[in-house]
Amino acid sequence: GTTIGAIKDIYSQLPEGVQIVHSCSTGYGEALIKAALLLDEGEVETVSHYYAASFFEPDVDCILDIGGQDMKCIKIKNQTVDSVQLNEACSSGCGSFIETFAKSLNYTVEDFAHEALFAKHPIDLGTRCTVFMNSKVKQAQKEGAEVSDISAGLAYSVIKNALFKVIKVSDASELGKKIVVQGGTFYNDAVLRSFETIAGCQAIRPDIAGIMGAFGAALIARERYGFKECKNTTMLSIDEINELTYTTSMAK
């Protein structure tokens, strides 16, 4: 979908008499969307994620976010973002990695993840690049590995990559005591269970794990609205949004 499409969908579902009084963008394209739609606020993604995570766990001290293409670990100290570690270069620890394998085996991501829950001998993929994991999985298939064992092995590898290659912890217990996991990859129960097994803890996975950034931005908009003297939003109306046009050009 698109930003415009999402906004139209929101407006179509608003109850009669309800209006948007404050707005906030975040994530990739945050400044662009804020400028294009004249939004009231724009906030960096890490802060939005913290707002969302602290809604579910006020004492959160670590946020692990694994999306389709990247992953990040946000450490919280004294209710403030203390450090951020990000991986964008390699997809071997991300959701797209599991999705690719599921499709290659003619499974949906959901069915592939479900298989992992019944694994008896998960294959050990360690913390490798996608290229090496591909060959390791193919070798395991030749040796007769069950789909469940492959799926569980991949779930473990996602977490091992996140913890030991990106965050570079020597002991998973170093992460924190109040951990919130989020990002679409954590909708996969096998990935969640792998994390809890390796980290030796119980993590909080909100049922909106895949849209925590947007939820955090909404919380920020609500909070800052309360501090405003002028209660009118600067955001374009739905009619103005419908009339938006754009042009593209190329230059050397």
Walk through the language-model features, giving the residues of each.
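Glycine-rich phosphate-binding loop plus the immediately following alpha-helix
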Residues: 78-121, 210-213, 219-223
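Acidic, glycine/GT-rich loop-and beta-edge segments that sit at the periphery of enzyme/chaperone cores
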Residues: 72, 223-252
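Glycine-rich phosphate-binding loops at beta-strand->alpha-helix junctions
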Residues: 28-29, 157, 170-198, 209-213
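Conserved phosphate-binding catalytic cores of ATP/NTP-utilizing and phosphoryl-transfer enzymes
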Residues: 6-12, 30-67, 72-83, 167-170, ...
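Conserved phosphate-binding/catalytic loops in two-lobed NTP-binding clefts
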Residues: 40-41, 45-46, 196-215
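N-terminal phosphate-binding loop and adjacent alpha-helix
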Residues: 1-20
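Adenine-nucleotide phosphate-binding core of ATP-dependent small-molecule kinases
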Residues: 135-164
